[in-house]
């Protein structure tokens, strides 16, 4: 008798640095209803690109990752490309930015904002 295995995808990782930056930006805005929305769109030099925005709305099919009282929200279409990815915030010589380490991306462009699968 075969037993079916249930596959649970690795969730999106929301790092401490990213959560702290989101918290700081939300405090600056003075609106506790805001969440960081991460999404994938077509475009960029590699075929897909990441996008970030602040959003008050949370849709029924959104995935929510909460950390330290702030939320990261991903729509269901983008989630399939971001399963197992890490959302981080980095400050360096090239500036300060949210970055995504995506194990699903087979190639990325030099700036890291677009990818292909």
Curated annotation (Swiss-Prot):
Cofactor detail note: Binds 1 iron-sulfur cluster per subunit.
InterPro entries (alphabetical): FeS_biogenesis (IPR000361), FeS_cluster_insertion (IPR016092), FeS_cluster_insertion_CS (IPR017870), FeS_cluster_insertion_RrpA (IPR023063), HesB-like_dom_sf (IPR035903)
A GO molecular function held by the record: 4 iron, 4 sulfur cluster binding
Tree of life domain: Bacteria
Keywords annotated in UniProt: Iron, Iron-sulfur, Metal-binding
Cofactor: iron-sulfur cluster
UniProt-listed Pfam families: Fe-S_biosyn
Residues holding iron-sulfur cluster: 45, 109, 111
Biological-process GO terms, alphabetical: iron-sulfur cluster assembly
Function: Required for insertion of 4Fe-4S clusters for at least IspG.
Subunit: Homodimer.
NCBIfam families tied to this protein: iron-sulfur cluster assembly accessory protein, PRK13623.1
Family the UniProt entry places it in: Belongs to the HesB/IscA family.
PANTHER family, per the entry: IRON-SULFUR CLUSTER ASSEMBLY 2 HOMOLOG, MITOCHONDRIAL (PTHR43011:SF1)
Protein's name according to its UniProt entry: Iron-sulfur cluster insertion protein ErpA
Protein encoded by which gene: erpA
């Amino acid at each position: 008798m075969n037993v079916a295995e249930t596959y649970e995808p690795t969730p999106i990782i929301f790092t401490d640095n990213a959560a702290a930056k989101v918290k700081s930006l939300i405090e600056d805005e003075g609106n506790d209803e805001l969440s960081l929305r991460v999404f994938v769109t077509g475009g960029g030099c590699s075929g897909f690109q990441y996008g970030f925005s602040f959003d008050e709305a949370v849709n029924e099919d959104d995935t929510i990752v909460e950390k330290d009282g702030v939320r990261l929200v991903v729509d269901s279409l983008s989630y399939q490309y971001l399963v197992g990815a890490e959302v981080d915030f980095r400050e360096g010589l090239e500036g300060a930015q949210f970055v995504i380490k995506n194990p699903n991306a087979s190639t990325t462009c030099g700036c890291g904002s677009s990818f292909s699968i």
